[in-house]
Amino acid sequence: MGEGDAFWAPSVLPHSTLSTLSHHPQPQFGRRMESKVSEGGLNVTLTIRLLMHGKEVGSIIGKKGETVKKMREESGARINISEGNCPERIVTITGPTDAIFKAFAMIAYKFEEDIINSMSNSPATSKPPVTLRLVVPASQCGSLIGKGGSKIKEIRESTGAQVQVAGDMLPNSTERAVTISGTPDAIIQCVKQICVVMLESPPKGATIPYRPKPASTPVIFAGGQAYTIQGQYAIPHPDQLTKLHQLAMQQTPFPPLGQTNPAFPGEKLPLHSSEEAQNLMGQSSGLDASPPASTHELTIPNDLIGCIIGRQGTKINEIRQMSGAQIKIANATEGSSERQITITGTPANISLAQYLINARLTSEVTGMGTL
C-alpha cells in the first residue's frame, strides 16, 4: 500500500478508495491490519464522524475555542464541527491512525472530567461511563456485528466497553449510530477495533451521510411572508417556506363555501373562502394572535396513499413539519377503496399541507418521480 492512500472509516464517503482493500487475503490481512492499527503505525488517513449534543460540543470547543484548538495541535488530527443551529452536531475527525486515536483519547478524557465535575454537586456515588456515538454506514454494520453477533461480542469482551449498534438508520441517511460506553481507555481500544473492521469491510455502494436538522423554530405567516420567532421579534424566514406558502394559496385555494374540490370528489372542504383565509392570516401585523384552528378532511384512493405516507412514514412526516399542521390518516376500512386524511391547523397550515399532498399525488399520477 503506497504512501498517501486515503481511507474513510468508519463513515466512508462515496468516492473513497476503500475498495482496494478487498484484493488482500482477508484473514492474514486482518491480523496484520489489527496489529498495525493497535500500534498506530498504519499509513492510512481515517475520517471518523461522531454525533454529539450541544452540551458535549460546548465541552469540546471550550472557552473561545481553546479546548478544540489544543486537541487539534496536540493530536495532529483535523477536528471539524458542523454548524451550530442544530440540537445534534457532527464532529468529524480526520488524520493518520495515531492522530485519530490521540484525538479520541482527549475527547474521552474530557468527557470523563465533565462527569467528575458534575458529580461534585450530586449525591450520586457511582461514576457513570463515558459515552460516545459514532456514525457508521449501515452497509458496514453487518461486519461490525458479525455472524450471530460474534464480532461485536468479541469487541465488548476484549475492550471492556459496551457497544450498541442502532437498529434503524438515522433520518434521511444510510447511516446508523454506534454507541460506545465505558472508561476512556476501553473506548479508545474499542474505536481501534472498530476501525479495523471498517477498513477490512468497505461500505457497499454510495453512503448518504446523516445531516442533523436545525432546531425547529415557530413559524407564522403574514402578508404572504413567513416569519420565525426569535425572542420578542418576528424575523423574515429565509428558506423556501414562504414560496411554498405562496404556491399553496395560489394553486390550492379554498373553494367557495359548500363547493367540492373537482380534483378529489369525496373531499370535504374547510369552512373558509380564500378571502377569509387571507384575512385570518393577519395581513396587518406579523405578530397578530394566531387564527383559530380548523379541520379539513379529504379522501385518498388506497392505491395512492403509499406515496403520501412514504417509506416508514418519511413523506407524511415531512409534510407535517413543513406545513405545521396535524395530519392523521385513518386506518383502512374493510370494503372501502379510500382512506380519510384529517388535517388540523390554521388556514395557512391547512392550505400548505393540502398543497404538499396534492403535489405528491400529482407527482405519482403523472410519473414525474418523487418530490
Swiss-Prot record:
GO terms for molecular function: C-rich single-stranded DNA binding; mRNA binding; RNA binding. Transmembrane segments: none annotated. InterPro entries: KH_dom, KH_dom_type_1, KH_dom_type_1_sf. The keyword 4Fe-4S does not apply. SMART domains: KH. This is Poly(rC)-binding protein 3. It comes from the Eukaryota. Single-stranded nucleic acid binding protein that binds preferentially to oligo dC. Keywords: Cytoplasm, DNA-binding, Repeat, Ribonucleoprotein, RNA-binding. GO terms for cellular component: cytoplasm; cytosol; extracellular exosome; nucleus; ribonucleoprotein complex. It holds the Pfam family KH_1.
